[in-house]
């Protein structure tokens, strides 16, 4: 499969700017300025990773930047080195617009050192004014506390902003130029599967690729797959994938021979879809050189319903396995594959994965359960209402919560931290239930699991609104545990063959977060992504880089980090965001 090499991975550029006056001024600042750049590079190279687990590489300009000639030389170097985002650092006054990063598509931040001997803050303000005037928004980083001139430590508040900027900026740069692959078309009239090419091109810098679902059928029939891998996968499935409850009537249940054929087909579909996304050199040895290339897809969606699933096995196994961090080839980064070709949820999954390196849970925002409703149905009264997240397809098996943190608590880990034992526990706590015949006449196998409680999650969703464009909504909260008999009653009356996460958002007492019902009532679509951790602040920063306004969130205002130019659009943070995004327009338009 096609993987980035160290030479072509996105890098972070560090730009040390300096007062250009020679004969004493510049010379006295060289050491301090270079040390700032080196300290930032050291921080990022030990904390920020690509999604395959490798630490990011930083590229520092060949010299400090005192004027436009050195700024241009730095820009040339960064192009050669595949730099995708830049951080400018300085302890002193520099020549504003002569030294700034002028690339219109590159996320950019400036750290102005808070010291008294030299006016780093003054340059920061001057450079940011230039960025705003030129329409090139940049992020402002300035420490709360005054530091000594020889202090090489990075304050904690500065670290937090540097790391947040780097995570979001790396995500922006990493998805640019990649493809979203639609396998099929619109599923059951779902708006998210009406792929909006302008959104992908102008906001994300991505291209759209399309294949008919018949391409999977062609590869099944003509054996365009690696048979050795199929054999390995079937052996692995037999050992680790346990069948679950079959709720179908007897006449719609499959016998042992039919189930074996079903397993073989869904395994082949998984391998074929992965090959469609990223290619597979093995196919070239089978005289399928074109198919071996793939579609350079960093994310994909499978329509499934109903044109495929009325006749052939659904994509539940394929979607769940590809989105997980473990399969017959061992622990690996997840692939991003959306149910029902919901391209907008796929991008939410992509955002979550890029920011965390972790597998994502794709879910329907299915039901709001009030205290009264739960008590009426089960006889048990919860402390508050909660939301049922459930969907048949793309919920990664990591969502079982069978990974463990250092204290033994349930969690979801990035692939580089997942152990074989943890991965197998996810499988052990998953059952594969025959698909409900009335919905999936072609059969299939749906993952059935229950997410452990007490895990922090952020649910989020991009929606497209005519005349406005994309908006992002975010709700941080936690998974919860219900008494087993309560879970059984609620789950069985919904769909016991699908994966369930019981979710409670963090409430603020106002607006969309007045209560749990309000969160459900304000959700903009039928699907959401559940990303492990409270990552709303990172999502807000990422959205601002792409000029996607955030319409709903419960993130503390002190954690909101957007370009400094946003401050020119009023004092109300949400309205400010809308006005700034509208003014500057999509990043790649």
From Swiss-Prot:
It catalyses: L-fucose = L-fuculose. It is found in: Cytoplasm. InterPro entries: Fuc/Ara_isomerase_C, Fuc_iso_dom3_sf, Fuc_isomerase_C, Fucose_iso_dom1_sf, Fucose_iso_N1, Fucose_isomerase, Fucose_isomerase_dom2_sf, Fucose_isomerase_N/cen_sf. GO terms for molecular function: arabinose isomerase activity; L-fucose isomerase activity; manganese ion binding. One of its GO terms (biological process) is D-arabinose catabolic process. It is an enzyme of class 5 (isomerase). GO terms for cellular component: cytoplasm. The keyword Metal-binding applies. Converts the aldose L-fucose into the corresponding ketose L-fuculose. This is L-fucose isomerase. It comes from Haemophilus influenzae (strain ATCC 51907 / DSM 11121 / KW20 / Rd).
């Amino acid at each position: 499969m096609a993987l980035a090499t160290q030479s072509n991975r996105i890098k972070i550029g560090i730009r040390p700017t300096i007062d250009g006056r020679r004969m004493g001024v510049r010379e006295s600042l060289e050491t301090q300025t270079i040390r700032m750049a080196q300290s930032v590079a050291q921080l990022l190279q030990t904390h920020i990773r690509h999604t395959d687990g490798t630490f990011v590489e930083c590229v520092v300009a060949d010299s400090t930047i005192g004027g436009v000639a050195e700024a241009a030389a730095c820009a040339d170097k960064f192009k050669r080195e595949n730099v995708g985002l830049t951080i400018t650092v300085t302890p002193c006054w520099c020549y504003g617009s002569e030294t700034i990063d002028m690339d219109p598509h590159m996320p950019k931040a400036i750290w102005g050192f808070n010291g008294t001997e030299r006016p780093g803050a003054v340059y920061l303000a001057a450079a940011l004014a230039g960025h705003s005037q030129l329409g090139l928004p940049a992020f402002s980083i300035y420490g709360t506390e005054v530091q000594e001139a020889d202090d090489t430590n990075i304050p904690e508040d500065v670290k937090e902003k540097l790391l947040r900027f780097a995570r979001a900026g790396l995500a922006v740069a990493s998805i640019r130029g990649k493809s979203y692959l639609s396998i099929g078309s619109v599923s059951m009239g779902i708006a998210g599967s009406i792929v909006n090419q302008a959104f992908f091109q102008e906001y994300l810098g991505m291209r759209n690729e399309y294949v008919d679902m018949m391409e999977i059928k062609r590869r099944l029939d003509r054996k365009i797959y690696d048979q050795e891998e199929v054999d390995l996968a079937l052996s692995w499935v037999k050992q680790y994938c346990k069948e679950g409850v079959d709720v179908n009537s007897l006449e719609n249940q499959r016998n042992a021979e039919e189930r074996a054929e079903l397993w073989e087909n869904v395994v082949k579909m998984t391998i074929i879809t992965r090959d469609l996304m990223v290619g597979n050199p093995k196919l070239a040895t089978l005289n399928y050189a074109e198919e071996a290339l793939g579609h350079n897809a960093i994310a994909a969606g499978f329509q499934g319903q109903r044109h495929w699933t009325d006749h052939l096995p659904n994509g539940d196994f394929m979607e769940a396995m590809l989105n997980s961090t473990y399969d017959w080839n061992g622990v690996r980064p997840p692939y991003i594959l959306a149910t029902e070709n919901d391209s907008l949820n796929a991008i939410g999954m992509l955002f979550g994965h890029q920011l965390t390196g972790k597998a994502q849970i794709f879910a329907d925002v299915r039901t709001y359960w009030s205290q009264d409703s739960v008590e009426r149905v089960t006889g048990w009264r919860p402390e508050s209402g909660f939301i049922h997240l459930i969907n048949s397809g793309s919920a990664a098996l990591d969502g079982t919560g069978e990974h463990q943190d250092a204290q033994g608590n349930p969690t979801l880990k990035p692939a580089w931290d997942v152990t074989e034992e943890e991965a197998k526990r996810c499988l052990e706590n998953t059952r594969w239930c025959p698909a409900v015949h009335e919905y999936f006449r072609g059969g299939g196998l749906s993952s059935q699991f229950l997410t452990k409680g007490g895990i922090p999650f952020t649910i989020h969703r991009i929606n497209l609104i005519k005349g406005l464009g994309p908006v992002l909504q975010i709700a941080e909260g936690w998974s919860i545990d219900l008494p087993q008999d309560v879970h059984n009653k609620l789950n069985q009356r919904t769909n016991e063959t699908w994966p369930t996460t019981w979710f409670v958002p963090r409430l603020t007492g106002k607006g969309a977060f007045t209560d749990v019902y309000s969160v459900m009532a304000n959700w903009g679509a039928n699907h959401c992504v559940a990303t492990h951790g409270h990552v709303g602040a990172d999502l807000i920063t990422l959205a601002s880089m792409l000029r996607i306004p955030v319409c709903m969130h419960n993130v503390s205002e002190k954690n909101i980090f957007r370009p400094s130019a946003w401050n020119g659009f009023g004092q109300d943070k949400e309205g400010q965001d809308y006005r700034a995004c509208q003014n500057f327009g999509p990043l790649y338009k």
